[in-house]
């Protein structure tokens, strides 16, 4: 069953993913990335409890402005000596010289979206429902989890094992279409008619992404908003189903 996400967190996490990839490609700067994120939430702060960013004089309990975290990501790689023992083997197998690639993951119970541990980190990602993780390159295994706090966002940077490689755009589109057919069959089984197409516009991924990537996002965005509308009216749907049965 589709899950409801905290309002805005999914969109902001998607935007952070695009900006982190742009930083890695050298097509944007930390200052520009911060400015862009501030259009989505008035303030962003970061907690780095494992000190993965290795910032000088950093208190692992305190939070810091996101600009400092973005600048660190822009100019250096992770300190692998700080990685926990259960992640060490994965880090050794990961090529730090490979292009840094970040992805947005939406783990659910029974489908961890490629996450491979540690268990505690996967559990936190499951609770949040969305996370941004680097699956190759100098920051492989670094994960961002965001939480809405008032009009801002609080981010935690955590050490996970590098995840499984993501699907290609074609594979993602095929999987998405299969899920759409499955959902349509379920709705038909409940005797429910189709509603109106959600009036939504998907975010632009940016110049670093292909037209195929954008097409998959636009389809997924429409489906996601349709699912959100269904979840918002879940009580009415269940009541209607009860009357029919």
What name fits each language-model region?
Residues 1-132:
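N-terminal intrinsically disordered, low-complexity regulatory tails that precede a folded domain
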Residues 44, 106, 143, 148, ...:
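Short, isolated positions within intrinsically disordered regulatory regions of eukaryotic proteins
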Residues 50, 54, 68, 174, ...:
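Polar/charged alpha-helical tracts
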Residues 133-140, 223:
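Charged interaction segments
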Residues 139-193:
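Surface-exposed beta-loop interaction hotspot
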Residues 184-245:
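Alpha-helical oligomerization segments
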């Amino acid at each position: 069953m589709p899950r409801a996400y905290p309002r805005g967190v999914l969109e902001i996490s998607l935007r952070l993913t695009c900006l982190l990839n742009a930083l890695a490609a050298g097509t944007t700067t930390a200052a520009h990335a911060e400015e862009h994120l501030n259009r989505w939430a008035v303030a962003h702060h970061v907690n780095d409890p494992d000190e993965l960013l290795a910032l000088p004089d950093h208190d692992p309990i305190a939070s810091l402005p996101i600009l400092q975290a973005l600048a660190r990501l822009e100019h250096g790689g992770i300190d692998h000596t700080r990685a926990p023992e259960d992640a060490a083997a994965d880090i050794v197998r990961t090529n730090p010289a490979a292009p840094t690639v970040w992805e947005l993951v939406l783990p659910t119970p029974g489908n961890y979206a490629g996450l491979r541990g540690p268990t505690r980190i996967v559990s936190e990602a499951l609770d949040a429902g969305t996370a941004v993780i680097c699956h190759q390159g100098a920051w492989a295994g670094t994960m961002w989890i965001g939480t809405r706090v008032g009009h801002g966002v609080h981010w935690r940077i955590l050490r996970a094992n590098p995840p499984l490689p993501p699907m290609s755009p074609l594979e993602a589109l095929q999987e998405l279409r299969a899920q759409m057919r499955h959902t349509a069959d379920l709705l038909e089984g409940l005797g429910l008619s189709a509603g109106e197409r959600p009036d939504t516009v998907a975010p632009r991924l940016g110049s670093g992404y292909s037209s195929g990537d954008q097409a998959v996002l636009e389809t997924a965005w429409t489906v996601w908003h349709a699912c959100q509308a269904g979840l918002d009216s879940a009580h009415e749907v269940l009541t209607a189903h009860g009357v029919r049965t």
